[in-house]
């Protein structure tokens, strides 16, 4: 099996993939109104940023990008935990997880 193409993947390929993932996540945030899908879209956007950090880190030969990924992953885990806890408590209270439902709840 010829695996030479793996060695030819450059920085541009990683950045294009990260941009596509980010756009997909942004589309999910802008177009969907479900809280769970919204959180998953934000996680996808954060993972595309992680891919960019790792790609630049590999390209420049530094470990700074890899270290930054750990911080982003920590923040993403905390964001997911808090977001899911809020979604569960909102669902228990209102039996609804649609964002449009909560626009009238300004206090």
From Swiss-Prot:
Subcellular location: Cell inner membrane
Chain segments annotated as transmembrane: 11-31, 36-56, 67-87
Recorded catalytic activity of this chain's protein: a quinone + NADH + 5 H(+)(in) = a quinol + NAD(+) + 4 H(+)(out)
Enzyme nomenclature, EC number: 7.1.1.-
Protein family according to the UniProt entry: Belongs to the complex I subunit 4L family.
Pfam families according to UniProt: Oxidored_q2 (PF00420)
Species this chain originates from: Bdellovibrio bacteriovorus (strain ATCC 15356 / DSM 50701 / NCIMB 9529 / HD100)
Presence of keyword Iron-sulfur: no
Keyword Heme: no
Superkingdom of source: Bacteria
Gene Ontology CC annotations of this record: NADH dehydrogenase complex; plasma membrane
Record-given protein name: NADH-quinone oxidoreductase subunit K
Organism ancestry: Bacteria, Pseudomonadati, Bdellovibrionota, Bdellovibrionia, Bdellovibrionales
GO MF, one annotated term: NADH:ubiquinone reductase (non-electrogenic) activity
């Amino acid at each position: 099996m010829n695996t030479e193409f793996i060695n030819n993947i450059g920085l541009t390929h990683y950045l294009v993939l990260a941009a596509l993932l980010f756009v997909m996540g942004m589309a999910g945030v802008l177009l969907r109104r479900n809280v769970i899908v919204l959180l998953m879209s934000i996680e996808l956007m954060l993972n595309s940023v992680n891919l960019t950090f790792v790609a630049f880190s590999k390209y420049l030969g530094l470990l700074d990008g890899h270290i930054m990924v750990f911080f982003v992953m920590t923040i993403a885990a905390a964001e997911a935990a808090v977001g899911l806890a809020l979604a569960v408590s909102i669902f228990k209270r209102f039996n609804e997880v649609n964002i449009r439902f909560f626009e009238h709840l300004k206090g």
